[in-house]
């Protein structure tokens, strides 16, 4: 059964989210200076949440062992890094760059694994190579994967609908080229559920009233046509959901 944490105050949600990540870091590193913390993150609003919970929280920030972090992206849009739609580009702008102003030099910061930008725009063969190369970089398993959930129930770039079965049903390959995203840009790469299933811990962060209907479908109805529900079914007790009261408005208090 998945774990559900709900918060009425944004400040409390963000702080507890940061504490959760910190706990997973400590579990992975166990005081070993040579150990690494393998974490994968989603794009979108996750970047701002990571800034608020890890960089801007003065109680959390001093305990983050950035040089031991190995950061990957659960999905990435096949656009240049300076494009506003680039997950890495937005992560750099929102999280990495502010680390300089916190006294951390970037060469002492986390190691971030990006797609091969030089292959972007090279067509089908190049797009498949981008996915294959990124898959080759991944660790055997992640200590933590941070996910979002779209209003349609998608997570990573795994979307509901039969036209996306080639992505959702893949359990052999770790990373695939998504060539028909319903949201621009249509070309992306995405983790498959095979990667998520092997993670030591998975966490969804969902905020806002726009998500209340899909949260009901995911957590109460448990519609197995939704990729986010498939994560719950596959990973079970390793999944934690962080919701604000707006997103959880249709979830019973005792759930």
Swiss-Prot record:
CDD domains: 6PGL (cd01400). One of its GO terms (cellular component) is cytosol. It is an enzyme of class 3 (hydrolase). Its main location: cytoplasm. Pathway: Carbohydrate degradation; pentose phosphate pathway; D-ribulose 5-phosphate from D-glucose 6-phosphate (oxidative stage): step 2/3. It catalyses: 6-phospho-D-glucono-1,5-lactone + H2O = 6-phospho-D-gluconate + H(+). Signal peptide: none annotated. It is found in: Cytoplasm. Keywords: Cytoplasm, Hydrolase. Pfam families: Glucosamine_iso. GO terms for molecular function: 6-phosphogluconolactonase activity. GO terms for biological process: carbohydrate metabolic process; pentose-phosphate shunt, oxidative branch. Gene3D superfamilies: 3.40.50.1360. Its EC number is 3.1.1.31. InterPro entries: 6-phosphogluconolactonase_DevB, Glc/Gal-6P_isomerase, NagB/RpiA_transferase-like, PGLS. Involved in the pentose phosphate pathway via hydrolysis of 6-phosphogluconolactone to 6-phosphogluconate. NCBIfam families: pgl. PANTHER family: 6-PHOSPHOGLUCONOLACTONASE (PTHR11054), 6-PHOSPHOGLUCONOLACTONASE 3-RELATED (PTHR11054:SF24). Present with 4320 molecules/cell in log phase SD medium. Belongs to the glucosamine/galactosamine-6-phosphate isomerase family. 6-phosphogluconolactonase subfamily. This is 6-phosphogluconolactonase 4. It comes from Saccharomyces cerevisiae (strain ATCC 204508 / S288c) (Baker's yeast).
């Amino acid at each position: 059964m998945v774990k559900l944490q709900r918060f009425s105050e944004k400040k409390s949600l963000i702080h507890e989210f940061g504490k959760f990540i910190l706990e997973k870091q400590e579990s992975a590193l166990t005081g070993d200076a040579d150990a690494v913390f393998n974490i994968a993150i989603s794009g979108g609003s996750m970047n701002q949440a990571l800034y608020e919970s890890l960089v801007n929280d003065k109680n959390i920030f001093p305990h983050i062992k950035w040089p031991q972090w190995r950061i990957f992206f659960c999905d990435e849009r096949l656009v240049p890094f300076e494009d506003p739609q680039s997950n890495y580009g937005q992560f750099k702008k929102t999280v990495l760059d502010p680390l300089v102003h916190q006294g951390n030099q970037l060469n002492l910061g986390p190691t971030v694994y990006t797609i091969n930008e030089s292959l972007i725009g090279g067509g089908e063969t190049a797009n498949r190579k981008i996915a294959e190369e990124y898959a080759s970089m991944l660790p055997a398993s992640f200590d933590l994967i941070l996910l979002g959930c779209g209003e349609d129930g998608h997570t990573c770039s795994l979307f509901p609908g039969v036209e996306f079965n080639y992505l959702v049903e893949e359990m052999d390959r770790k990373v695939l080229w998504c060539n028909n995203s319903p949201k621009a840009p249509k070309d992306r790469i995405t983790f498959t559920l095979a990667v998520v299933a092997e993670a030591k811990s998975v966490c969804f962060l969902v905020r806002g009233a726009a998500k209340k209907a899909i949260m009901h479908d995911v957590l109460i109805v448990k519609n197995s046509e939704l990729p986010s529900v498939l994560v719950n079914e596959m990973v079970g007790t390793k999944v934690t959901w962080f919701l604000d009261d707006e997103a959880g408005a249709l979830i019973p208090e005792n759930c």
